[in-house]
């Protein structure tokens, strides 16, 4: 069987539900099986996975940094819905300046994107899996 291109849609926060951690475990399985993980789109509460100010206890799994590491090692694009992020207090430097906000807190490695990035991923991937 040839390698498939996967894209993920994550709608759950990094902590408090299983959605994001299940998505991360699925992403690891996809890569481990020899498939190509192309992009991950964080939407709704899923945008909280990109919050640079998340600080889990030292004995807890740091899912936010795990996403970063996965992206760096596998060249996965981490897209964050800009509208959902701004509603939840997550912004990059550009948006913070545009909106006259005090600071930016988008975790490095994540990119604020519109729904067009999700549409493109849906069209170009063999499998889109939502969590």
Curated annotation (Swiss-Prot):
Is Protein biosynthesis one of the keywords UniProt gives this record?
A: no
Q: Which terms are listed as keywords in the entry? A: Cytoplasm, Transferase, tRNA processing
Q: Name the Enzyme Commission number(s) assigned to this protein.
A: 2.8.1.-
Compartments it resides in: Cytoplasm
Q: Write out the catalytic residues in the record.
A: 81
Q: Which family does it belong to?
A: Belongs to the DsrE/TusD family.
Functional description taken from the UniProt entry: Part of a sulfur-relay system required for 2-thiolation of 5-methylaminomethyl-2-thiouridine (mnm(5)s(2)U) at tRNA wobble positions. Accepts sulfur from TusA and transfers it in turn to TusE.
Q: What is the protein's given name? A: Sulfurtransferase TusD
